[in-house]
Amino acid sequence: LRGPRAGFVLTREENARNLDRTVFPGMQGGPLCHIVAGKAVCFGEALEPSFREYAQAIVDNAQVLAESLLEGGILLASGGTDNHLMLADVTPIGLTGKIAEEALDRAGITVNKNMIPFDQRKPLDPSGVRIGTAALTTRGMGTDEMKRVGAWILEVLRAAEDESVGQKVRAEIASFCADFPVPGIA
């Protein structure tokens, strides 16, 4: 779902009381009405037939991006993806997840450093990065654009310490994204 971060728990009546006691107040604060409203809009979108197409486009985009990274020598946990994200092991190209995250961020590409299965590194400086395609898909990007995004990721990672590469890619991305504005912000 697009929209604010939040969670909902669906349960049976006989479990509701225990669940309420477990979650609130210890694990959850008070409800924020703007978050509840945002999630309501998201659930409304999910009821529309176009949401199924959007969800499939996210997966299609992730698979093309994953293939692009694999072809470029990046290892992916599970060898690819069948959902909206992928977990890339960047150690074979001499990087850590933290270094990769920082280099990509300087270039205008947002990923999260992330541990990989059986990671020997510490959580704050793991071996991988997590990459998703939901935001790109929301902006209207398709599989052709994912090939370009994959090329940018590879270019930045191969020159992670070279800030001029990051600056060049950042400028290219800014120009590229002008054709894919964030919905509702124009």
Give names to the regions the model predicted:
Residues 64, 68-72, 99-107, 152, ...:
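Generic non-transmembrane alpha-helical segments
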